[in-house]
Amino acid sequence: VMTYMVPPYVGAMAWLRLLNPTVGTLNKFIADILHLSEMPFNIYSVGGLIWVLTTFYYPYAFITISRAMEKMDPSLEEASKISGASPLKTVATITMPMMMPSIVAAALLVFVSAASCYGIPSIIGAPGNIDTVTTRIIDFVYLGSSEGLSDATTLAVFLMLVANIILYLSTFVVGRKQYITVSGKSTRPNIVDLGKWRIPVTI
């Protein structure tokens, strides 16, 4: 979660240093090892923008969801396994429904944070002619005209409406069910050995 403590534009500059399509350090290293005629990655792309945004805002989801998993009563999953349910069915019918409020809250937090971010899109997206709502708002403001300010205000209101609609939908989805677990004693979360799936799940 170190990226949680680093300003987004600083991280964007770091990734730019690594994956710049012409002089990126990591790009040149991979190209030299594999004897490639051109750089393998282009940070000035939609994929590059999504990657950098993901690396910076996944800690929001990680902290929210991991904390909820620590507090979840493992006896529910144990009861499911004793009843003959497979691990996959236990996850689908017990773990995921219990985690849904935290997952929805984390998704909402990440969306709002990423959608309102300006630093990363301006550094990564702008050179590749990739516009986002925040970069367009700043572009309109820099026009300095009344029309530019009006367009910037319209986009800002649009972004706010989208965030509120998503908040309402998430509240509606979570509010349809009750997620209260009553337990008379403290519990310890189960530690699951992922084995060969550890690296894929981490990625």
Where are these regions (language model features)?
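Short amphipathic alpha-helical coupling elements at transmembrane boundaries
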Residues: 1, 28-35, 74-82, 93, ...
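Glycine-rich helix-loop "coupling/hinge" segments at transmembrane-helix boundaries
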Residues: 20, 119-146
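Transmembrane alpha-helical segments of polytopic membrane transport and secretion proteins
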Residues: 171-203
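Membrane-water interface segments at the C-terminal ends of transmembrane alpha-helices
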Residues: 1-70, 98-119, 123-125, 152-171, ...
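Loop-to-transmembrane helix entry/capping segments in MFS-fold secondary transporters
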Residues: 80, 149-152
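Glycine/proline-centered hinge or cleavage motifs at structural transition points of membrane proteins
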Residues: 83-85, 97
